[in-house]
Design a protein with these regions (language model features):
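Hydrophobic alpha-helical connector segments
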Residues: 82, 93-122, 173, 177-180
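Short secondary-structure transition hinges
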Residues: 78, 111, 117-156, 163-166, ...
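Amphipathic C-terminal alpha-helical segment
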Residues: 119-122, 129-132, 156, 160, ...
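Short hydrophobic/aromatic patch on the recognition helix
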Residues: 63-73
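Basic, helix-initiating cap at the start of DNA-binding domains
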Residues: 1-48, 52-64, 77-81
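Amphipathic, non-transmembrane alpha-helical scaffold segments
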Residues: 38, 80, 84, 88, ...
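Base-recognition residues in the alpha-helical recognition helix of bacterial helix-turn-helix
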Residues: 46, 70-72, 82, 86
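Hydrophobic alpha-helical bundle segments that form small-molecule/ligand-binding pockets
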Residues: 100-103, 148-176, 191-194, 215-218
Length: 221
């Protein structure tokens, strides 16, 4: 990411670096911290696109100087890295949870879907940003590589469940995996948490009924 794209000037960069290096043990300034800065940045990235967001825009939205932002992070690329890592770490934790389930592959696959829904509900802005990256920067390329790794894990579980005879064999496992997680990922487009509304468990129940009722093999009549 170039300085021009960030809207960063040399003085702000030097001031921010000096603050980070010289005050490494100091806590964030009153009124905001790294977490609140990250959440605002993710909101703006989702609204304007990562490439369309400058450090000037982030400074304006936060109501603080750019040097104050550099006190916490090296630039907007670090904010993007933190954001997509949070989403991906959540999804890989979901896969670890699924791997620990004893029994058949289809049971592990359903656990993975349910745990992934919980991640999307809990970290919706971060997952939204992850699903919108296009590989224009090194951070985005790395995120896409991790997404492909996750996709392979899902496809592997689908293939295993098919080999067990629990999933219909007339659909390619890679296609099944994409369709299944297309349903999961669609949550970012329509789900909005609200009091009294459906929670992660209710959404996961509905999604699994729709998906797995169509995927499971039927006993021969």
């Amino acid at each position: 990411v170039t300085n021009e794209r960030d809207g960063r000037d040399g003085g702000d960069r030097r001031d921010g670096r000096a603050q980070r290096d010289g005050r490494a043990t100091r806590r964030g300034r009153p009124g905001y911290d790294k977490e609140s800065l990250l959440r605002v940045a993710v909101k703006v990235f989702n609204e304007r696109g990562y490439d369309g967001t400058s450090m000037d825009e982030l400074s304006k939205r936060l109501g603080i100087s750019k040097s104050a932002i550099y006190y916490h992070v090296a630039g907007k690329d670090e904010l993007l890295q933190l954001a997509v890592d949070r989403a991906l770490d959540g999804l890989f934790a979901a896969s670890d949870e699924a791997a620990a389930v004893e029994g058949r592959a289809i049971d592990r696959l359903e656990r993975l879907v349910r745990a992934s829904v919980a991640v999307l509900v809990a970290e919706q802005p971060f997952v939204t940003l992850l699903l919108r990256v296009r590989g224009n920067t090194a951070v985005e390329k790395q995120a896409l590589a991790r997404r492909r790794e996750f996709d392979r894990l899902v496809s592997g579980l689908v293939a295993e469940a098919e080999a067990d005879g629990d999933i219909r064999p007339d659909i390619d496992p890679a296609i099944t995996a994409r369709l299944l997680f297309g349903l999961v990922n669609s949550l970012i487009e329509w789900y909005r948490p609200r009091r009294g509304g459906a929670g992660a468990d209710e959404i996961a129940d509905a999604l699994c009924k729709v998906a797995f009722d169509g995927l499971r093999t039927r006993p021969a009549e």
